[in-house]
Amino acid sequence: MSKITSSGVRENVHKLLEYSTETKKRNFLETVELQVGLKNYDPQRDKRFSGTLKLPQVPRPNMTICIFGDAFDVDRAKSLGVDAMSVDDLKKLNKNKKLIKKLAKKYNAFIASEVLIKQIPRLLGPTLSKAGKFPTPVSHNDDLYSKVTDVKSTIKFQLKKVLCLAVAVGNVDMEEDVLVNQIMMAANFLVSLLKKNWQNVGSLVIKSTMGPSFRIY
């Protein structure tokens, strides 16, 4: 049973959007984040959960993606205007930790041709996995544009050592209804990952990049 109602969330979304679109409009597209504070959870002892959820709409349209591809996928990526790297490009990084870290920082997510996915750890070491950015596989039969959209629409909840986490659930250009729906979906999905569900939730807050926080739970 959800402890948040769409009317309660809507009220806060309304205030958040009003602030970002009228009170203090920024000259870039602000992301809306769901910030979660957990309680009665011990990251050392309890299971560190992780889960992914595909939202109906892309939270961050300007999210950057790079494709590690064979010749076929590198060509497809170029025709879509998406950055791509071939196996040779990856070999040129020569397992240099600094360069691989730089690559992991430069992009929000990665996609790799199915045929290459097994080679990624050998070529790049554990850096991408540690950053929570291990590539999503794509096959030649998949529509690459849809795959890119899927990756952009998917949010990831991952508990590390601290009891707070934040995920992008939308942006301030979205319709109120859409944003409310995305927040509700994300919050309820997160709660389903927790050992004691709502008893582990200390607080839920929504916030745009530069705006104030609004508590929804």
UniProtKB/Swiss-Prot annotation:
Family matches, as Gene3D superfamilies: 3.30.190.20, 3.40.50.790
A single GO cellular-component term on record: cytosolic large ribosomal subunit
GO MF annotations, alphabetized: RNA binding; structural constituent of ribosome
GO BP term (any one): translation
InterPro entries assigned to the protein according to its UniProt record, in alphabetical order: eL8/uL1-like (IPR050257), Ribosomal_uL1 (IPR002143), Ribosomal_uL1-like (IPR023674), Ribosomal_uL1/biogenesis (IPR028364), Ribosomal_uL1_3-a/b-sand (IPR016095), Ribosomal_uL1_CS (IPR023673)
Subcellular location: Cytoplasm
Pfam family, one: Ribosomal_L1
Similarity annotation: Belongs to the universal ribosomal protein uL1 family.
Subunit structure, interactors included: Component of the large ribosomal subunit (LSU). Mature ribosomes consist of a small (40S) and a large (60S) subunit. The 40S subunit contains about 32 different proteins and 1 molecule of RNA (18S). The 60S subunit contains 45 different proteins and 3 molecules of RNA (25S, 5.8S and 5S). uL1 forms part of the L1 stalk.
Function: Component of the ribosome, a large ribonucleoprotein complex responsible for the synthesis of proteins in the cell. The small ribosomal subunit (SSU) binds messenger RNAs (mRNAs) and translates the encoded message by selecting cognate aminoacyl-transfer RNA (tRNA) molecules. The large subunit (LSU) contains the ribosomal catalytic site termed the peptidyl transferase center (PTC), which catalyzes the formation of peptide bonds, thereby polymerizing the amino acids delivered by tRNAs into a polypeptide chain.
Protein's UniProt name: Large ribosomal subunit protein uL1
